[in-house]
Amino acid sequence: MNEIDEKNQAPVQQECLKEMIQNGHARRMGSVEDLYVALNRQNLYRNFCTYGELSDYCTRDQLTLALREICLKNPTLLHIVLPTRWPNHENYYRSSEYYSRPHPVHDYISVLQELKLSGVVLNEQPEYSAVMKQILEEFKNSKGSYTAKIFKLTTTLTIPYFGPTGPSWRLICLPEEHTEKWKKFIFVSNHCMSDGRSSIHFFHDLRDELNNIKTPPKKLDYIFKYEEDYQLLRKLPEPIEKVIDFRPPYLFIPKSLLSGFIYNHLRFSSKGVCMRMDDVEKTDDVVTEIINISPTEFQAIKANIKSNIQGKCTITPFLHVCWFVSLHKWGKFFKPLNFEWLTDIFIPADCRSQLPDDDEMRQMYRYGANVGFIDFTPWISEFDMNDNKENFWPLIEHYHEVISEALRNKKHLHGLGFNIQGFVQKYVNIDKVMCDRAIGKRRGGTLLSNVGLFNQLEEPDAKYSICDLAFGQFQGSWHQAFSLGVCSTNVKGMNIVVASTKNVVGSQESLEELCSIYKALLLGP
């Protein structure tokens, strides 16, 4: 479908889609973007979320104005997907008709025609009222703290990727003594044109825009209205594959096929099974925990790494090795049968570092699904430190070199790059392949998402600053048994948000036991 088919587009967009295309506010999805939308089309993934705490409260009018300024500068935050076969798209995307052929021409995306604060703030949306009641009740019972139970409740939220009244993300406002003023929020995204780093950028932009408001703002009925604001709105950025070369080397395919064959036959699998998100709630239960490492403890960890490893070493390999060693110590996960010798670690990696050195272009891609990944399959036995404690620091140094080399060689681009190659898009139905690779497969390894350390500088004249950040996600249909979301600040330290399922760990109490072992090892390896 190369021509605009207005008959099949969402009705909310029919009148102005052509105008939006001409203005740079609508276009075909890129192939990288389509991969993340496919997870939603097939109900294989729900959301990631980031908790952010500011130093002071903002009013409803301040929040509306701040969001308006952020969205005008970053139109990606206003986008929705225009599905084929509206409004029967959900059934169509999971039909034999859709699966029967490839779809190299992707659906359109466009900005919303209008957006009110009620279209963003999840508290005010009746379809989420039952979950919101539980979230606010838990927040009150925890005396204003972000807890593992709140995170677990957010994993049940489905954010529509097709609008029509809201974007592909939402904001939960957590009230304390003031019901109409907030300083604690949760950014929830379905991963369409958004990633963990996008959510961190959101809170930094929110802080900056609130600081830019010097006088009480007037009441705004809309965050954005296309017919009035289109001239103020920046153009949507081009698909990221047009500015970054994702193409893998020629040997990538045979190497991947060989390593995949070996891994599939030798990997350890748990009792947990991947399934569509609706089925998870029927047959399994998500379990969650949050580990906080205080700023003092965090500095001690960094000092410990520095004293034991020559040269520069990031914290990610330390987190990775400590996690697998903890699984060994725990003794309730790695129980391999014959020939189950391998596990895997899947580490998302930001692609923005590969953008051209141009400030304007880098600003354009602050928001988006601009993340690749590196993954490798270590031997389970190498993390057994009962009789080999002297191998602990050399193992961390080894994986630091492995990760660093992968990033230097741009391997984090290659997995996505293979899936967006022209011949793959032309001959393969990506949605069907995703389902075939996931549904019914047993969970095994770990997803480790470290979105980074974000130091907050003291600015005497600034009313608003960031006090805390915590990133987490349930891995959905990805085959990993565990998800670890890591985010750090110099104010509240490092937060590690852990998710798994009862079929993997047994119970919530078992996960808490595992996380206690992990925290103890992080603090005193």
From Swiss-Prot:
Segments of the N- and C-terminal domains (residues 24-41 and 508-525, respectively) are predicted to be amphipathic helices and are essential for endoplasmic reticulum and lipid dropplet association. It comes from the Eukaryota. Its EC number is 2.3.1.84, 3.1.2.20. It catalyses: an aliphatic alcohol + acetyl-CoA = an acetyl ester + CoA; a fatty acyl-CoA + H2O = a fatty acid + CoA + H(+); 3-methylbutanol + acetyl-CoA = 3-methylbutyl acetate + CoA. Major alcohol O-acetyltransferase that uses acetyl-CoA to synthesize acetate esters from various alcohols, producing ethyl acetate, isoamyl acetate, isobutyl acetate, butyl acetate, hexyl acetate, heptyl acetate and octyl acetate. The alcohol acyltransferase activity is promiscuous with regard to alcohol but relatively specific for acetyl-CoA since ATF1 does not use any other acyl-CoAs (C3, C4, C5, C6, C8, C10, C12). Acts also as an efficient thioesterase in vitro with specificity towards medium-chain-length acyl-CoAs. This is Alcohol O-acetyltransferase 1. It is a peripheral membrane protein. It is found in: Lipid droplet; Endoplasmic reticulum membrane. The active site is at H191 (charge relay system), D195 (charge relay system). Residues 24-41, 508-525 are annotated as: Membrane association. Pfam families: AATase. Found to be inhibited by cadmium, copper, zinc and mercurium divalent cations and sulfhydryl reagents. Inhibited by the addition of unsaturated fatty acids to the culture. Present with 1990 molecules/cell in log phase SD medium. Its main location: other. The keyword Plastid does not apply. Keywords: Acyltransferase, Endoplasmic reticulum, Hydrolase, Lipid droplet, Membrane, Transferase.
